[in-house]
């Protein structure tokens, strides 16, 4: 039985990506799993809900998605995985919501997600990894 693994990637944080590479490779090799990589572009309302400012002169969402997909595909090349077992996805919205939606849609057998050590912001707002652990219907491996 081939498993499906979802790997959310923050394309703006290469350190987090480095942390998950060996874990993803090891899990994928167990039974030739299909690995879906997902990056999420936070929507403007999501930024506003966090009280963050944003520029009124943002590029078009299609341009942002194309650039994000290009960056994600470059990151995927760092993983030692067969190209025919890998797929890249880009979504827009709340990262935790989109990760959970994709995990359910695939359906994923496992989510492998990198996380920072908690800080005050994490305690106030919660982390994406914590939300995924609480609400995912599949196994979740959090890598710190």
Swiss-Prot record:
Coiled coil: none annotated. InterPro entries: Rossmann-like_a/b/a_fold, Universal_stress_UspA, UspA. Disulfide bonds: none annotated. SUPFAM superfamilies: Adenine nucleotide alpha hydrolases-like. It holds the Pfam family Usp. Homodimer. Belongs to the universal stress protein A family. This is Universal stress protein F. The lineage of its organism: Bacteria, Pseudomonadati, Pseudomonadota, Gammaproteobacteria, Enterobacterales.
